[in-house]
Amino acid sequence: PIIKGINKGAGLNGIHVINCDPHSDMRPMLGRHSGNGFLYAYSEGYLKKYAVFGLHESYNIYSALELFEQHKEQLHFETYDDIFVREQISYQLALNNCLHFCKGAACGVEIDLDSIQNVPVSARTPSGMLPIDVRKYVYHCGSELEVCYLHIAEGAPVLAHKQMDNKTGKLVAYIITDFVKAVKRNIR
């Protein structure tokens, strides 16, 4: 709904999106928007280019990865495994690849908090980016792209099996502050 709303509200004909997320959210379109929201936006023409930064290889189905392979001009990813596990590409080069891919049009910035290690979310991960990695990501996105929105997804500071965790709110505040500073710097 965000991508469609930006297009319609701003009179655009497709935007780019960069997403820091272990999941591509490009699962088959089987009805409900769960794990397939970006595929709906792409199929409907609202999403022209899509880059995923920090994709976890084992969290994505084959058909989604195959779609990226078949549509390299519009779809790109850099994996968490290549960056942090195998160290085949540096963090900065992987991020630069995604940023370069998304330049040239209005761009949405997405952050799924389940990309960050041990943050209380519905799909909490013991193996993810550190908060500083995501803060750098959002800062570079805000300062280098023609940003049209920021969406922070999946925060769940209160889960049925957990006590209230105010660290999630603090982390989100850091992310928003870094983003605002970067966009402000980019406008100058």
Predicted segments with their positions:
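Conserved alpha-helical scaffold segments that buttress catalytic/binding sites
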Residues: 1-188
